[in-house]
A protein has these predicted regions:
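Intrinsically disordered or highly flexible coil/loop and linker segments, enriched in small
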Residues: 32, 141-145
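Short, internal acidic amphipathic alpha-helical interface segments
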Residues: 69-110
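Charge-rich, low-complexity N-terminal segments
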Residues: 1-56, 104
Length: 154
């Protein structure tokens, strides 16, 4: 087994090309995929999907020296029933594959995950984007109903 030194830089060009090509094909073929954009300064892609339970889901794919990170903004910080919301989401974490619910700096909820570069291929990109979409569609409404019950009249 070859160990890579922490300061040894990995050539990211092949991964960038793979992600670019996959996203271009998906944008052409997948009617749920509305937009793809890229920030080349930080090797980050923005993927916007049309949803049913939530109007839009935006996924950020960030290519780093060791991992591909992916995340989506799930919902704002709950206004009420904080414990119930966080318990609901933590219990869902047990069922998720390759992702987890996380609380951001501003207390908003995110779905986040990462994979080693060695795992990045078209099948995994499809799994990441598809799973993110499915998890948002499945868990968004119940979490929102708990955290914003008064506002939603629930």
């Amino acid at each position: 087994m070859r160990l890579t030194a922490i300061d040894e830089l990995v050539d990211l060009a092949p991964y960038e090309g793979l992600i670019e090509r996959w996203l271009e094909r998906e944008l052409a073929d997948n009617p749920l995929l509305l937009a793809v954009d890229r920030d080349p300064d930080v090797r980050r892609w923005y993927v916007r999907l049309r949803g049913e339970q939530r109007d839009f889901t935006t996924i950020w794919l960030t290519l780093g020296q060791r991992t591909l990170r992916y995340e989506t903004y799930f919902m704002p910080a709950p206004e009420e029933q904080h414990e119930a919301v966080y318990e609901y989401l933590l219990r869902r974490n047990h069922r998720l594959f390759g992702m987890r619910f996380s609380i951001g700096d501003e207390d908003a909820v995110y779905l986040v995950g990462q994979m080693p570069l060695s795992a990045v291929d078209e099948v995994e990109l499809d799994r990441v984007v598809g799973s993110t979409y499915a998890y948002v569609e499945q868990y968004f409404r119940p979490a929102l109903a708990l955290g914003f019950a008064s506002r939603l009249g629930a």
